[in-house]
Amino acid sequence: VIAANDSYEEGELYFNGAETSHYSETDWEKYREKNIAMIFQDFNIIENLTVLENVELALLRVEDKIKRRKTAEDLIAKVGLTAQKNRKGSKLSGGEKQRTVIARALAKDSPVILADEPTGNLDVKASKEVAALLKAVSKDKLVIVVTHNPEFFVEYATRRVTIFDGSVKEDKVIRKPLPKTSADKEEIKAGKWQNFKNTMHIGTLNYKSRPKFTAMM
């Protein structure tokens, strides 16, 4: 629902304090394009393209080819794949493929990154590396991880939400996000950011707080 890949019939999804239940299909498309970047379990990269070409696909809005290439290379460096940037997707390991997907998600420059089982197809070593990388990029993003492997993320998550049979069974703050302003501190102190029981409220405070990393299990 947060990714706008499915609709909802009960409750309300707020985004920056605004209701979304009245959104039309066009509204949802705009919302998704502007606000959401996805990381999938099955990598979802184009196997016959290089790492660089896969990341550049998310930068087609950048008309200047030189700037597009520089931005892509910077993002690839950020996820530690500079040495593999000219390697085709079919030649990458699982961990390298997921790093490519993370770089592509960052290229979209959306405020929210949704990671759907990002370690599901990875071994333990690669899973730990991807979890640490998602923590690193969460410093200026809201990262929501859906996972059946919480052990890889509990070290980094600021909030853990356990969902069973369509209901929230646990909503636990593991560690408080770090506020940037005194106003944020007052909101955190007042507990205004903790309500998740009946609605998913991705509010202004979520974007101001850093780091922001929610694991949903």
Residue ranges of predicted features:
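Conserved ABC transporter NBD signature motif
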Residues: 11-19
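Conserved ABC ATPase signature
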Residues: 88-92, 96-98
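ABC-type ATPase nucleotide-binding domains, specifically the catalytic core motifs of the NBD
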Residues: 56-69, 78
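ABC ATPase C-loop
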Residues: 81, 85, 105-106
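Helix-to-loop junction immediately C-terminal to a conserved catalytic motif
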Residues: 3
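Catalytic Walker B motif of ABC-type/P-loop ATPase nucleotide-binding domains
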Residues: 113-116
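Conserved signature/switch motifs of ABC ATPase nucleotide-binding domains
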Residues: 33, 87, 108, 139
